Structures are given as structure tokens and as C-alpha cells.
A protein has these predicted regions:
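Alpha/beta-hydrolase fold nucleophile elbow
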Residues: 113-124
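Structural cue for short, hydrophobic secondary-structure segments
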Residues: 44-47, 71
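Proline/glycine-enriched tight loop/beta-turn segments at coil->beta junctions
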Residues: 35-41, 67, 114-116
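Alpha/beta-hydrolase active-site loop
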Residues: 90-111
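Active-site glycine-rich loops that stabilize anionic/oxyanionic intermediates
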Residues: 39, 47-50, 125
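Conserved alpha/beta-hydrolase
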Residues: 52, 59-85
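An N-terminal hydrophobic leader/cap segment in hydrolases
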Residues: 1-23, 29-34, 120
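Donor nucleotide-sugar binding loop of glycosyltransferases
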Residues: 27, 51
Length: 125
């Protein structure tokens, strides 16, 4: 697990964010999480062109309600690696690559000891 940046001043997120780089396949993605109460873990899945920091307030609302939260910069989004040289491009060769990203995020949730059950809150993609 390699620490990754988290821009708290932009996110308006709760304290205690842990951000890490993960590398499913050839691309590096960024995952952030907050460990809170024992009500379970909400997996916040941002939409296309979005980043972890956009969901800081939502994470704060969930943490205040006793949920842990984990979220992701999908490959080609936020601070994650891109497949093409253009930093504004979010291209993937196959949608299955997003499944690899999700698998890596779930493995990080397990590694971090984030509580069950898991809930999904997603936008766009």
C-alpha cells in the first residue's frame, strides 16, 4: 500500500481520510477511505470525469451516521493513470478494466478492515 494525495481543503470531507495508490493491472488508481462506526461500509463510486474529492461532503454525511466509506478514482479519472497521453482523456480499452478497479477497491476495503455489510452509492458510469 502506497500513500496517495488527498486534497482535504477541496473535499470538505471528514477528518481521518486514508488515500492509497493501488495497481490493478498496468494502471495505478487512487482509493480513499474513512473508518467510522459499525453500521457497514458505503462504497461511493464516482461518475465519469469525477474524482474522490467531489464526494467529500457525502462521505462526511455518511461517517456522521456511523458508516465507513470507501471511494475510488477509476482509471482515466481524477488522479488515476490514463491509458492515453492526453490528461483529459478517460479512455479504457475494455469495460472489464473498471471491474479490475472495483475488485482492487474491494480488496482494499477488506485489507483496511472496513465493516460489513457493504452498500453501494454510484453515479453515472
Amino acid at each position: 500500500m502506497t500513500p496517495a494525495p488527498f486534497h482535504a481543503e477541496l473535499a470538505d470531507a471528514p477528518p481521518g481520510a486514508v488515500a492509497v495508490w493501488l495497481k490493478p493491472g498496468a494502471m495505478r488508481i487512487r482509493v480513499a477511505w474513512w473508518k467510522a462506526g459499525d453500521r457497514g461500509t458505503v462504497m461511493l463510486l464516482p461518475g465519469r470525469t469525477e474524482c474522490i474529492e467531489k464526494y467529500g461532503r457525502a462521505a462526511g454525511d455518511l461517517v456522521r451516521r456511523g458508516y465507513s466509506v470507501i471511494t475510488i478514482d477509476w482509471r482515466g479519472q481524477g488522479l488515476a493513470d490514463r491509458a492515453l497521453p492526453d490528461p483529459m482523456s478517460g479512455h479504457v480499452g475494455d469495460f472489464a478494466e473498471y471491474q479490475q478497479d472495483l475488485d482492487a477497491m474491494l480488496a482494499e476495503a477488506d485489507r483496511a478492515g472496513l465493516p460489513q455489510p457493504r452498500f453501494l452509492l454510484a453515479h453515472s458510469m
